[in-house]
Design a protein with these regions (language model features):
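A short, structured surface patch at a secondary-structure boundary
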Residues: 83-137, 141-147, 248
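His/Asp/Glu-enriched short active-site or ligand-binding loop at hydrolase and phosphoryl-transfer sites
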Residues: 108, 233-256, 276, 303-304
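Short helices/loops that flank or line small-molecule/ion binding pockets
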Residues: 131-138, 160, 259-268
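Short helix-initiation/N-cap motifs at beta->coil->alpha
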Residues: 68-72, 123-132, 252-261
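Extracytoplasmic substrate-binding proteins
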Residues: 65-67, 73-74, 140-141, 151-228, ...
């Protein structure tokens, strides 16, 4: 743990360390006193050896919590985190899902779900963190966004002595694992298990209902200028496949590749699903209507799913997935009728 912050925990391991430290201090005092009172050299040597061995033992820190993060780093805590800062809106949601919401002391802008998150102190944007504010909040754990937070900022947090755990679910089925690991760090495992069970049950149901249906070529549009889609390594690709769709840009490894209108026309999606950056259907989605040769235009399959239900890798992704699956079902019905 960082020397910056003094723990007031009643954790048994912490109490043991404090007791051990007091014992070391007492032993050292006895040695000093024995020297002043001219006690035998052999006795002083034995006491010195005891002090050396005890010091060596206490220096071998034993951590009660050890969890691997998404970069393979072993994050160690000597007790469950009590003051957590989240560096991404999606991570804030995951922490609440893990039952650790009441341990959050700071979040970044746009951390708006659940409602309680809106009342938490803001420590900047995900890409522009206020280091001074973070230090003032004295976190014992900072949860960082692997591909979103600037690497220099994450490194700086570590240099300042903070414990940083890096996370980002990249697959739909990995969300339960992320929730479970965060719960382990926060000591909220029992609260998290109910959320995990509900998620896994819903995921199985959606998979059974949609994955084996007639494939629908699908173009997922994140933004219009530049034209951005989702590649094969993005969690959104998992959702498209879950719904029985085929991501027309699944062959691109980038998470959010820039694509051209020409490439979309060539791949001729049967459905276009947009999210944009707001809760309202983006006006630019209708710009595809001028391309009458598109199958998606012929079947009126220009759909919208709110971005927070797909672009945040949290349990709510299944709400967005259900909406997408129902939309692709509409396209299937229209293709059959045509």
């Amino acid at each position: 743990m960082s020397f910056l912050f003094e723990s007031t925990s009643n954790n048994p391991l912490t109490r043991f360390r404090r007791s051990f430290s007091r014992t070391l201090m007492l032993t050292n005092f006895i040695i000093n006193q024995s020297a002043q009172k001219n006690l035998s050299t052999s006795l002083r040597e034995k006491l010195s050896q005891m002090l050396m061995l005890a010091t060596l033992a206490v220096s071998q820190t034993v951590f009660s919590i050890e969890v691997l993060d998404d970069e393979g780093s072993l994050v160690k805590l000597d007790e469950s985190a009590q003051r957590i800062i989240s560096l991404a809106p999606s991570l804030t949601e995951l922490l609440y899902a893990a039952g650790a919401g009441d341990k959050l002391v700071g979040v970044v802008e746009y951390s708006d779900h659940p409602e309680a998150a809106k009342a938490l102190p803001i420590i900047g944007r995900y890409d522009m963190l206020d280091m001074e504010k973070i230090l003032q909040l004295q976190p014992d754990l900072v949860v960082a966004w692997q591909t979103g937070n600037p690497r220099a900022s994450v490194n700086r947090l570590r240099e300042l002595g903070l414990t940083v755990y890096i996370a980002e679910p990249k697959r739909l089925e990995s969300i339960p694992s992320h929730i479970r690991r965060l719960a382990t760090l926060a000591g909220t495992e029992k609260l998290a298990e109910k959320v995990i069970e509900e998620f896994e049950t819903k995921l199985i149901t959606l998979t059974e209902n949609y994955r084996t249906k007639t494939p629908v070529r699908t173009f997922y549009q994140v933004w219009d200028r530049p034209l951005i889609s989702a590649g094969g390594n993005e969690l959104i690709n998992d959702i498209i496949e879950l719904c029985g769709g085929v991501n027309i840009f699944a062959d691109i490894e980038l998470l959010a590749p820039k694509v051209s209108v020409e490439s979309v026309l060539i791949r001729n999606p049967q459905a276009i699903i947009a999210s944009g950056m707001d809760i309202e259907r983006p006006e630019w989605l209708d710009e595809w209507l001028k391309w009458e040769q598109l199958s998606a235009v012929n079947t009126s399959s220009l759909f919208f799913v709110p971005p927070e239900l797909l672009q945040r890798h949290t349990p709510r992704a299944l709400i967005g997935a259900k909406s997408m699956c129902e939309q692709l079902d509409q396209t299937r019905a229209k293709l059959v009728s045509n």
